[in-house]
Amino acid sequence: MLGPESDGRRPTQGERGPGYPGEPMDKYQVLYQLNPGALGVNLVVEEMETKVKRVIKQVECMDDHQASQALEELMPLLKLRHAHISVYRELFIMWNGEISSLYLCLVMEFNKLSFQEVIEDKRKAKEIIDSKWMQNVLGQVLDALEYLHHLDIIHRNLKPSNIILVSSDHCKLQDLSSNVLMTNKAKWNIRAESTEAMYLRKSLRQSPGSLETVLKTMEEKQIPDAETFGNLLPGMLQIDPSDRTTIKDVVHITFLSGSFKSSCISLTLYRETVPASITDMLLEGNVASILEVMQNFSGWPEVQFRAMKRLLKMPADQLGLPWRPELVEVVVTTMQLHDRVLDIQLCACSLLLHLLGQAMVHHPEAKALCNQAITSAVLSALWSYPEEESLLVLVYSLLAITTTQESQSESESVSEELQNAGLLEHILEHLNSSLESRDVCVSGLGLLWALLLDGIIVNKAPLEKVPDLISQVLATYPADGEMAEASCGVFWLLSLLGCIKEQQFEQVVALLLQSIRLCQNRVLLVNNAYRGLASLVEVSELAAFKVVVQEEGGSGLSLIKETYQLHKDDPEVVENVGMLLVHLASYEEILPELVSSSMKALVQEIKERFTSSLVSDRSAFSKPGLPPGGSPQPGCTASGGLEQMIAWN
């Protein structure tokens, strides 16, 4: 289906694609077409499953050989992980049968605003672009280019329209091109050499005197930083590429020797390093002195790294828990300043997780400093290195804590923000692709539970495949109690949110019963599993029969008896067991099974010992913010349901 702004021609389906078998374009819906780029057409599409918008650049190739060469050359783009480079999701080759042409397709991030549009808007308004903002963007672009050049990758198509703005102060490079495709001179001459900028560049190269005129005009007009540009442009416009200024020289001229400023502190990597012996000597003091060193040497990543390592080894009493606001602030600032350095991100996340964990253990009543800065910093780290498993586990664990530690209104806001950022889809993608990584699965399920806890779901569609994903996870880790516990929590919340389809009820009930049998000693697992069972049984007689039917390992009713005997002194567990019995007893066909299984004696004992606590309005069965779908109907308390069961003959 084509969007209203489309040009009316739908691409035919792909034939080959390393990232997706069969027909890759089948999983995308074309919404509209952007202005053509230098070498191809840019389509804004939506993934059919996740509803996430992407950009697909389609480049027409002369033949199969050229397409295959270009695909091979561009495959390294899939591994690029940098805060200021757009993530490439997929590359594939497709055949357009309508015009008998072969296309290379590059699937990239979608962002509405580019630097080109900022320039055009300022021209229309006859306004000057803020110099400090421009310098900050330039620093990020240079940082990204240095990273690419370090990997021997050349952008080949750098221009304002290929600098996208993720936010007001964060840009990314996109639309890297291939040397193979750039050799198509006919297409390149038509689309690229006809621009005013290209004519100007050729003119300046051919006539050095004209460049002097331009620079003199800039000086006369008092253009900001004209002197810096005067030092840069002659070297950048050399005809022979080997004579041109390198990216490191550009950084040195603009940010180290010049007056430019940028928040992209990886540029400070060009400074001389501080010897480890001196760093260790500076870090011998207490927390206050270490923080002072970190602040005084904020631009030296090696100092920041060793300082955080030192803090990680400190005992809780020296760290000053529950919270030292200045410590958290310095760590977050370090993450933001050194977003290019993976070791810094890993160490900072480990330290934040350590601080959160220690504070919750030693001071459970203390509220964490889970402010926007922490969430933003760790989320930025995740997007910069989305496939780095060790970082992914740390970030998932941190976000799970920060989301649940906020007040209810703040937590809902954070949960919505994270969902809008695509975190839900990210979790599901990695539960599927990283099934062999236990830590990814456990932390992913924990964060999924935290996002679902408030019941504010931006888009329920992706959640429909969660039961099947969890089934795969539990099949992979059949004896893992922690995995089962995390899974039961997610199943319970999904049942309350109505995100489990009727055809999935039997499967989910079986998995919940299996988890209880596996880990009767885990109270949290038991509570969440029985809550999930009660929620499903309330709305489905099929689920109720699945609980009571005799299967391998015994029936659910015998399991209920075992649970009660093990946890009879825990009111919360007994309440959740009682709620399940109430919903089972609401089906006439199930009542005979309850009686024949000698459940009346158990029910009588629960009634006598816990009647006062078995009131649904005060039950842990319902969580604030969650819809009432899994809760008893008004007036239907557990104690009332148990009365009916006892009276049944």
UniProtKB/Swiss-Prot annotation:
Q: Which Pfam families match?
A: Pkinase (PF00069)
Please give the record's comment on domains: The protein kinase domain is predicted to be catalytically inactive.
Which regions are flagged for Basic and acidic residues bias? 1-13
Name used for this protein in its record = Serine/threonine kinase-like domain-containing protein STKLD1
- Segments forming domain Protein kinase: 28-379
Give the family per the record. Belongs to the protein kinase superfamily. Ser/Thr protein kinase family. STKL subfamily.
InterPro entries named in the record: ARM-type_fold, Kinase-like_dom_sf, Prot_kinase_dom
Domain of life where this protein originates: Eukaryota
Give the organism, scientific name. Macaca fascicularis
Asked whether the UniProt record includes DNA-binding among its keywords, one would answer no
- Region annotated Disordered, chain positions: 1-23, 621-640
Fetch the PROSITE patterns from UniProt: PROTEIN_KINASE_DOM
Where do the annotations place ATP binding? Answer: 34-42, 57
Which one of the record's GO molecular function terms can you name? protein serine/threonine kinase activity
